[in-house]
Amino acid sequence: MQNPTARQYCLATILAAFAAFIPVAVAQSLLDNYSPVSLADLQDPPENDWLMWRRTANHWGYSPLAQIDKTNVGSLRLAWAWTMEPGRQETTPLVHDGVMFLPQACDFIEAVDATDGSPLWEYRRPVVDHIATLACANRNATLYKDQLIIATMDAYLVSLNARTGEVTWERQVGDWTVGQHYSGGPQVFDGKIITGMSGCYYINTGCWITAHDADTGEELWRTNTVPKIGEPGGETWGDLPNELRRGGSAWMPASYDAELNLIFMGVAVPIPWGSIQRDTRGGDVLYTNSTLALNADTGEIVWYFQHIPGGNWDQDHPFERIVVETEVTPVADAVSWINPNITSSARRKVITGIPGKPGIVWTLDAATGEFLWAKETNYQNVIVGVDIEGRKGITNPEIDITEIRQRKLVCPTTTGGTNWFSVGYSPQTNALYAPSNNTCMTFYLNPVNPVVGGYHSSATSIMVPPPDSDGQVGLLTAVDVATGEARWTYRQRAGIAGSVLTTGGGLVFVSDDARRFRAFDADSGEILWEQILNSSAGGFPITYSVDGVQYIAIAAGGGINYRTLTPEIRQRGGGNMLYVFRLP
C-alpha cells in the first residue's frame, strides 16, 4: 500500500472540517432509512432512483420523471455542486432513497446527500504500482441489497456496505501486475454480477466476461472473448499460438433481457491493432469487434455478430447494446444497409444503438442476432457493407493495410465518431438520440515485436478533417428505431462527446466539447435550455427525485479533445466537478 500523499492528507482534512458542519442526526437518519435494493428493483427501478449505469438493464438511459418538462426546463438552476477527485472522469452517479453514490477516478467512492451534496462516507482503494494507463476511468458501480458493488483498477470485485462504505467482501478476478483492470463497471442481473475484463495487452491471454454470485462474489462462469486453439472460433486466428492471441477487452457494461435470459456484451479490438503485426492476415479474429449474446446462466455464446472482421484501425465495438421491442420497418432510402429478407412491419425485440467507433447504428434481432438494418450517423469509410449470411460487416479494401508505415486516410479517428459516451432511447418517441462526430485520421502501423510482455501501442494516428468538410464536427441525430429515418439532426462546430439522458418530460440532455450542457426537445430538436460548465463532461448524466423534487446531475471534467479540428475551442485538464440542477 502506498503512503498517503500530502494532497490526500490535505483533502482528508478539508472533508473532515466540512463534515463537522453537517448535522450528524440528519446524515445518520438518511443512512438508517436506506432500504435494500431488490432484484425486482433492478429489473423495474422505482422512478425516483438511478440504480445502475444506464438506469435499466436494457440501457435506455431513460427516466420517466416528468416534473422537469418542455414548458419549464428553461428555468432550471443550480441546486448544488461538488468538487470531485482529480483524474480520468467518466462517472455515473447512482441514487437510492436520497443517497447519491459517486464513483470517481482510481476507485475513490463517496456517498453524499442527494439533495445538497453533504458527504456521508468515503472509500478510497489504495493505488497499486504499475497501474494501466486507462485503469482509473471508473465509469460505474451498481447497487444490490445493502451493497454497492464496484469493479476496480486492480481487477477486483469489491462489495461495500452501502450504509457505511466498509468492505464486506472482495474477489480478485484478473492480474493487475500485467495490466488487467476494470474500466466498465459491474451490472447485477438475476443475482449475478456481470463484468468484462480490460487490459489484456501484455500476457498470454485475451480477455473474458464473468458472472459472480452477487451475495458472495463466487465466480459462476467465465467466457473467453478470444477463443483458444480448438475452441469454436479459434480457427479465425490462424496458426497463432494461444499466448499471442491478445485483446478482446470488454470495457463497457453489459445489457440484459430477462425474457430471453440473454446478456449482451460488446468486445473491443485485437492486439496489436494490425493484422500484419499479429500475423493473422485474412482471419476474422473472433470475437473481437463483435456483439455477443450469452446465456445468463452458463455464459455460453448463443449468437454473435462481428461488426469488423480482422480489425486493423482501432475501431472498438464495446459500447452499449440497447434492447427495444419495436416494429421493424426500415426505409431503404433512410438507412445505409438493409436485410432484404426481413418481414416488414413485424414487431420484435431488437438490439440497437451505436456499438462501435465508426458511428453506425446497428439493429439486430435480439433473440437470434439476425442483421436487420444499419445507418451511418457521421462520416466514415471503414465499413462499406454487410455480409448477412456470414454475420459480419464488410470492410473497405481501399484502407486495407499491407505494409508497415503505409499511410491511409481512415474515418473516423481512433477516438471514434462515437466512444464511451452513450446513445439514449426514449419510449415516448421510439427514437435513439445519438451523439457523434465527423473526424478522420492519417493512420499507419508501426513496427512491433509481438512477444509475451510487449506493450500494445502499435500505430500512429494524426487527426484531420473529413473530405469536403464544412467544419461542423459535432452531431446529435434522432433516429427512428422502427424505420431508421432521421427525425432531426443538430449540427455544430464543437464536438459532441457527451452521453445522452432522455426523460418522461420529453427532453434530451447532452453535453459537448465547448462546455455546454443542453436540453433539447425530443420531438423537434429545438434547444430549450443551456448551461455553461467549467469543462466538457466525460460523465453520464442522470435524473432522480427526492421529496418530490426532480434533479438533473452531470459530472464535468474529462471528455475528448478535438482541438486539431477546432483549435479555437480550448479545454483545460482537471477540474472534475459534479453539477446538480433543479427547478426554482
Describe every region a protein language model picked out:
Residues S29-L78, T225-G230, N396-I399, P465-P466, ...:
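Blade/loop signatures of beta-propeller domains
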